[in-house]
């Protein structure tokens, strides 16, 4: 299926892994039962130009993915998970995140979202970062919350290195 998608002209795939959380499986179990299937799909997608790996959940085992064949890495930057800059430093790959995911996004105030987004933009300083939700954003959230994200994007100015 992955190869057929690329044959049809897609630039890449979004691939989510849901079995890499501390306490869910051991490293040995992951290597034996999960990684071979991940590699099969990511190898088929390797000729794509924009493959994103999303590591679902909390307490992720980030080290297990350092050499996965994906161009971009996405995960929830919640307590217990690596920060955007930590993951980028660990893997050298661009990261996707910085907007709270569901259900938190819909439960936050616009000011809290602005603060969170500003902090993530500042953390990465406009480098190796695509601003996106930690997971997804539920449909039907208050438009003011989406506008809070937009305001921070327009207000952001990277510092000179």
What is each model feature region?
Residues 1-161:
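Active-site loop segments of alpha/beta catalytic cores
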